[in-house]
């Protein structure tokens, strides 16, 4: 009800200023305004909205809250625009004002959504002020080359994808970046080791697969930790890379490409669109970071290293912690690369991305790292006042024992294996149900449905949790047909698709909607919340709010369909109720799509 709220708030604000002109003028001089505190009603019996500002305004207006409410109501009742939106207001308690929307207002809003691909969600570029919006960068997934994607990458990948989808839906230009770990000491170790055990892999594509590459990396890391000579050789290889040695760069490119192929298989399965821009991209800009921080007077030399001491972030000794920008040996680290990335991303095109907002989706363990990096970027004055950089942290994926999810042998769970298991379990469940119902379906149907449900279950189980907290991973819970799960929502979409097939396409045939049953109005009000939920998720970056809304909408719809006739109703009720079914289906499908979840017509 975002548009209704905006219009209503405008009328209430105007009425408040007209009713109390002296107080309005007084607060305006101090740069403030009389705030009516218009909010969504907390309970259905309080109507649709509540004006809660009378108690706070009493101190300014010098009247009792109830007197203020009575005067404001009188002013509102003389406003024709307000009366077209709301029924006569009611005072509750010491001065709260309850507002209930006119049925005609609700019907007009529902009618407009029936023919609106955006389902009432306003585009940011509809506003003249925001026509020159800068791009938004969402930095997510970011696996390391020569390592397989594991369950820890799941959260960053699907949370980041959902955030990017929602921002794009609102009209922002979104740049999806995969900041892969494609540079550094690990490549020196790996190349040095492969020169001895698999030299062909450094000159020829597809000689080894990623699984073998991971094992080679583990062995290289072990040798690096135990053998000083190997350690020195590895560092020399890193120097060769940094100097642009052709053989070293060829080997590096082959290793990156091998990993990239495997990453893309996962992204294809999850339907993730993302542009790779690894750490190596920012190598040419690292010296610029040093130069900028030196000019700004932020860079300090400490024990041979160049660092910036952070404000308000102290170590155990009570002294400010340093953010190391350049090590004593002249090398750079993650913080330097992240600063170079921020600097590049905020610079205007063509020298950078020209971003107005950068969102980093990583685990909460990196919160302190980003707090330090963001602080330095702000103190260096790289961040314009109109721009934002944000860390979107998330908790751990745990097993049902409450510990970090691991395989039986204690290894980190590979993301590929987790997806395979989800699809396999979904397939077994589908085959069992088909057998119980004595239904015959093609193998292609079973494969498509099991793949869709399996992937959807994994995504939704994660996204439906508050991302800040840890959550316990359970195949049984996520694949259940009851409760706040993907299968439950997918079944609701399938149910509506079946109703629509029987009822026909009504988007163009319903001329005038008319409703009388409480179940209809309850569903209408729930449908109209979609826009405000999307706007809230855009600001708070909490996809679980959208999940909760879709679950509530599906429950409200099921009660509506179970309690009153739809297909067997008399006209015009039949067509009007079918229109609500169709709009509910569209809303559920769009909401699931914004979570990166595909839907089905049949299950």
From Swiss-Prot:
Top enzyme category: ligase
Keywords: Aminoacyl-tRNA synthetase, ATP-binding, Cytoplasm, Ligase, Nucleotide-binding, Protein biosynthesis
Catalytic activity: tRNA(Arg) + L-arginine + ATP = L-arginyl-tRNA(Arg) + AMP + diphosphate
Predominant subcellular localization, coarse grouping: cytoplasm
Swiss-Prot/TrEMBL GO biological process terms: arginyl-tRNA aminoacylation
One function term, GO molecular function aspect: ATP binding
Matches recorded under Pfam families: Arg_tRNA_synt_N, DALR_1, tRNA-synt_1d
Gene3D superfamilies, sorted: Arginyl tRNA synthetase N-terminal domain, HUPs, Isoleucyl-tRNA Synthetase, Domain 1
Highest taxon listed in the record's lineage: Bacteria
Membrane-traversing stretches: none
EC numbers for this chain: 6.1.1.19
Subcellular localization(s) per the UniProt record: Cytoplasm
Cystine bridges: none
Record-linked SUPFAM superfamilies: Anticodon-binding domain of a subclass of class I aminoacyl-tRNA synthetases, Arginyl-tRNA synthetase (ArgRS), N-terminal 'additional' domain, Nucleotidylyl transferase
Keyword set includes Repeat: no
Motif ('HIGH' region): 143-153
InterPro entries assigned: aa-tRNA-synth_I_CS, Arg-tRNA-ligase, Arg-tRNA-synth_N, Arg-tRNA-synth_N_sf, ArgRS_core, DALR_anticod-bd, Rossmann-like_a/b/a_fold, tRNAsynth_Ia_anticodon-bd
GO annotation, cellular component aspect: cytoplasm
PROSITE patterns attached to this UniProt entry: AA_TRNA_LIGASE_I (PS00178)
Family membership: Belongs to the class-I aminoacyl-tRNA synthetase family.
Assembly mode: Monomer.
Name assigned to this protein: Arginine--tRNA ligase
Source organism per UniProt: Prochlorococcus marinus (strain SARG / CCMP1375 / SS120)
């Amino acid at each position: 009800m975002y548009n209704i709220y905006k219009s209503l708030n405008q009328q209430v604000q105007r009425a408040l200023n007209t009713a109390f002109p002296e107080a309005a003028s007084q607060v305006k001089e101090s740069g403030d305004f009389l705030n009516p505190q218009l909010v969504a009603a907390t309970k259905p019996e309080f109507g649709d909205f509540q004006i809660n500002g009378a108690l706070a305004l009493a101190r300014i207006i010098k009247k009792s809250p109830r007197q203020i409410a009575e005067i404001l109501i009188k002013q509102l009742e003389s406003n024709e625009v307000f009366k077209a939106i709301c029924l006569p207001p009611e005072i509750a308690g010491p001065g709260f004002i309850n507002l209930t929307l006119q049925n005609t207002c609700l019907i007009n809003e529902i009618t407009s959504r029936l023919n609106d691909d955006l389902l009432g969600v306003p585009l940011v570029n509809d506003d003249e002020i925001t026509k020159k919006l800068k791009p938004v960068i969402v930095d997510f997934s970011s696996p390391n080359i020569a390592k397989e994607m594991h369950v820890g990458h799941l959260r960053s990948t699907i949370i980041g994808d959902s955030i990017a989808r929602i921002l794009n839906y609102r009209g922002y230009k979104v740049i999806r970046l995969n900041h892969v770990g494609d540079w550094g000491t690990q490549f020196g170790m790996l190349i040095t080791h492969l020169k001895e055990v698999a030299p062909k892999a450094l000159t020829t594509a597809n000689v080894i697969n990623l699984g073998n590459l991971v094992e080679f990396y583990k062995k290289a890391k072990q040798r690096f930790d135990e053998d000083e000579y190997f350690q020195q050789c590895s560092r020399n290889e890193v120097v060769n890379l940094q100097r642009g040695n052709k053989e070293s760069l060829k080997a590096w490119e082959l290793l990156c490409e091998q990993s990239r192929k495997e990453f893309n298989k996962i992204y294809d399965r999850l339907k993730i669109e993302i542009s790779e821009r690894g750490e190596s991209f920012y190598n040419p800009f690292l010296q610029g970071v040093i130069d900028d921080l030196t000019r700004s007077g932020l860079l300090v030399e400490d024990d041979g290293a160049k660092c910036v001491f952070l404000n308000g972030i102290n170590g155990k000794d009570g002294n400010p912690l340093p953010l190391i920008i350049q090590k004593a040996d002249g090398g750079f680290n993650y913080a330097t690369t992240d600063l170079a990335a921020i600097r590049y991303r905020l610079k205007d095109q063509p020298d950078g991305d020209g971003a107005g907002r950068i969102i980093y989706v990583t685990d909460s363990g990196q919160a302190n790292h980003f707090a330090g990096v963001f602080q330095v970027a702000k103190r260096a004055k790289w961040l314009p006042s109109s721009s934002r950089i944000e860390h979107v942290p998330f908790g751990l994926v745990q097993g049902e024992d409450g510990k970090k999810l691991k395989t039986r042998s204690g290894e980190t769970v590979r993301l590929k294996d987790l997806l395979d298991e989800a699809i396999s379990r979904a397939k077994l469940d589908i085959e069992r149900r088909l057998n119980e119902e004595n239904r015959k379906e093609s193998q292609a149907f079973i494969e498509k449905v099991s793949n869709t449900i399996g992937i959807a279950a994994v995504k939704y189980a994660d996204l439906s949790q508050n991302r800040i907290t840890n959550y316990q991973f359970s195949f049984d819970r996520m694949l259940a047909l009851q409760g706040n799960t993907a299968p439950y929502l997918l079944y609701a979409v399938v149910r509506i698709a079946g109703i629509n097939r029987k009822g026909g396409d009504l988007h163009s045939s319903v001329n005038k909607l008319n409703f009388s049953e409480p179940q209809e109005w309850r569903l209408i009000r729930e449908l109209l919340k979609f826009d405000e939920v999307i706007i809230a998720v855009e600001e708070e970056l909490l996809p679980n709010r959208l999940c909760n809304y879709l679950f509530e909408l599906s429950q409200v719809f099921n009660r509506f369909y179970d309690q009153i006739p739809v297909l067997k109703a008399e006209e015009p009720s039949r067509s009007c109720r079918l229109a609500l079914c169709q709009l509910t289906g569209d809303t559920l499908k769009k909401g699931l799509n914004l979570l990166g979840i595909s839907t089905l017509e049949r299950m």
